[in-house]
Amino acid sequence: IIAAGNKIASKPYKYGGGHARWNDSGYDCSGSVSYALHGAGLLRRPLTSGDFMSWGAPGRGRHVTIYAHPGHVYMVINGRRFDTTGRDESGSRWQARSRSTAGYVVRHPPGL
């Protein structure tokens, strides 16, 4: 997951990016999370933010936790957040700062 996330961490934010094809010029939030999980063999097709609300197992994972609501998704891996922000055109990034989880459904890949 981390290696795949690193591959796209410098790509710009692109609405809908990562949904038509895995290798894209930029990624949105769900495209980014999908790409990273796909890189670990955990996804076969890209999911939307809403799809992630019911994907995997409920609750926090031991290592990987996904936070999703209908308009946004991000994940935390061993305390590091993999997230996007479209406001300043920065795409997928690893971030040390946490963010509010209010309103998010919490899921995780089984076993992780």
Regions found by a protein language model. Name each.
Residues 2, 34-112:
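...with weaker cross-activation on analogous glycine-rich loops/strands in unrelated enzymes
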Residues 8-26:
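Active-site nucleophile-His-acid catalytic modules used for acyl/amide transfer and hydrolysis
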Residues 14-16, 28, 68, 105:
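Compositionally biased, intrinsically disordered low-complexity regions enriched in proline and serine
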Residues 21-40:
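Active-site nucleophilic cysteine motif
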